[in-house]
């Protein structure tokens, strides 16, 4: 029986799933929006939205909890200094999943874009490689 077992397994082991969502969360916080499969995008909300709620608390314990998920001091700083203040006064729903019309070529997986509902300034780390090209 599947009582109280929420979340999709995505055909991965628990450690692989945890690493996948950590990496997707890092990419979303860095770039502001990412393209992935629809199911991964919907499950990613369960990781990212609590992180933004932590950023709204903005205390030392919240920073340490965010670091335990992200593992990067630069991303934690960006989360608390840039992304969090953009959502002050918003009671939830920090991300938006937009379904794309074309499925992924090869396996026909439905694709989606996950992005923040409020505009967050692009980080210098994400902008630097774009300028170098």
From Swiss-Prot:
Keywords: Ribonucleoprotein, Ribosomal protein. GO terms for molecular function: structural constituent of ribosome. NCBIfam families: L17. This is Large ribosomal subunit protein bL17. Belongs to the bacterial ribosomal protein bL17 family. It comes from Nitratidesulfovibrio vulgaris (strain ATCC 29579 / DSM 644 / CCUG 34227 / NCIMB 8303 / VKM B-1760 / Hildenborough). Pfam families: Ribosomal_L17. Transmembrane segments: none annotated. Part of the 50S ribosomal subunit. Contacts protein L32. One of its GO terms (biological process) is translation. GO terms for cellular component: cytosolic large ribosomal subunit.
